[in-house]
């Protein structure tokens, strides 16, 4: 019984962590993160570092595959962050 209780507790903690990362817009994410994903499942993700996948910044702040790059980096034509 204790094992079942422990498993349930761990599962609930994991679900709370997943839910806390969901977002509806950029305003839901902390600094250094953007709201990215499909229409049904968006999560706060970190801005892209050097060589990581990215999407160019846009005025609507809507991203599906990944976030824009960190400051001082730019998103190349092959959607990878590189030095500006």
UniProtKB/Swiss-Prot annotation:
Disulfide bonds join 23-35, 29-44, 34-67, 54-75, 69-81. Residues 1-21 form the signal peptide. One of its GO terms (molecular function) is toxin activity. InterPro entries: Prokineticin_domain. GO terms for cellular component: extracellular region. Expressed by the venom gland. It comes from the Eukaryota. It is found in: Secreted. The keyword Ribosomal protein does not apply. Keywords: Disulfide bond, Secreted, Signal, Toxin. Its main location: secreted. Belongs to the AVIT (prokineticin) family. This is U8-theraphotoxin-Hhn1e. It comes from Cyriopagopus hainanus (Chinese bird spider).
């Amino acid at each position: 019984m204790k094992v079942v209780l422990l498993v349930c507790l761990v599962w609930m903690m994991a679900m709370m962590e997943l839910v806390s990362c969901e977002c509806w817009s950029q305003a839901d994410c902390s600094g250094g993160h953007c709201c990215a994903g499909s229409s049904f499942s968006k999560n706060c993700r970190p801005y892209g570092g050097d060589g990581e996948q990215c999407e160019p910044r846009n005025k609507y702040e809507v991203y599906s595959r990944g976030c824009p790059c960190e400051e001082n980096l730019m998103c190349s034509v092959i959607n990878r962050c590189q030095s500006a």
